[in-house]
Amino acid sequence: MNIVNSKILFLSFTLLLLLQSSIVESDSICLSSGVASTVAMAAPGSVQKGDEEWRAILSPEQFRILRQKGTEYPGTGEYVNFDKEGVYGCVGCNAPLYKSTTKFNAGCGWPAFFEGIPGAITRTTDPDGRRIEINCATCGGHLGHVFKGEGFATPTDERHCVNSVSLKFTPAASSL
């Protein structure tokens, strides 16, 4: 077997293991061992596009973060020190993700929220088990990571560390 075939086999096996071991959960969706519970919002993955379609509607930086799981530099995002009332949605598909009432200042350099809108966020444990990735449940866009037990005085003791580039803010007057 040549080296290219070996790498493809290794990557395929790794992906299979990740799919079998990943747990995706949110407030109104829980996928574990292939069994799904009730979904209150649009079904996960209901907005599906190829890379070329995403590139046509996203800026290069949005594509890098949402579709390639990138991270913006800390302190550079539009919504880090933003405190207006409204809803933060996915910049890729416009699905509502977070209410402004759940945003707090974690001092981490990225917008921080203590919970998402029920059914809007999926969670997947990274392969090394150290972090939990959060994605838009509707289009699968990468948002950032969630951290638990850091001692913040929030109702959930969770910090959703979200890339500003992944978000689109809608003021309260025209939001949900």
Swiss-Prot record:
Keywords on record: Disulfide bond, Electron transport, Endoplasmic reticulum, Metal-binding, Oxidoreductase, Redox-active center, Signal, Transport, Zinc
Enzyme Commission number, as recorded: 1.8.4.12
Domain MsrB: 51-172
MF (Gene Ontology): metal ion binding; peptide-methionine (R)-S-oxide reductase activity
Signal peptide, first to last residue: 1-26
Sequence positions that bind Zn(2+): C90, C93, C136, C139
Superkingdom of origin organism: Eukaryota
Main localization category: endoplasmic reticulum
Top class in the EC scheme: oxidoreductase
Name of protein: Peptide methionine sulfoxide reductase B3
Function: Catalyzes the reduction of methionine sulfoxide (MetSO) to methionine in proteins. Plays a protective role against oxidative stress by restoring activity to proteins that have been inactivated by methionine oxidation. Involved in cold tolerance. Eliminates MetSO and reactive oxygen species that accumulate at the ER during cold acclimation. MSRB family specifically reduces the MetSO R-enantiomer.
Subcellular location: Endoplasmic reticulum
Residues the record marks as active site: C161 (nucleophile)
UniProt GO BP: cellular response to oxidative stress; cold acclimation; protein repair
GO CC annotations on file: cytosol; endoplasmic reticulum; nucleus
Family recorded in the similarity comment: Belongs to the MsrB Met sulfoxide reductase family.
Cysteines engaged in disulfide bonds, as pairs: C108-C161
Disruption phenotype: Increased methionine sulfoxide content after cold treatment. Increased sensitivity to oxidative stress induced by cold. Loss of cold acclimation.
Pfam families: SelR
NCBIfam families: peptide-methionine (R)-S-oxide reductase MsrB
Cofactors demanded by this protein: Zn(2+)
Cofactor note: Binds 1 zinc ion per subunit.
Catalytic reaction annotation: L-methionyl-[protein] + [thioredoxin]-disulfide + H2O = L-methionyl-(R)-S-oxide-[protein] + [thioredoxin]-dithiol
InterPro entries for the chain: Met_Sox_Rdtase_MsrB, Met_Sox_Rdtase_MsrB_dom, Mss4-like_sf
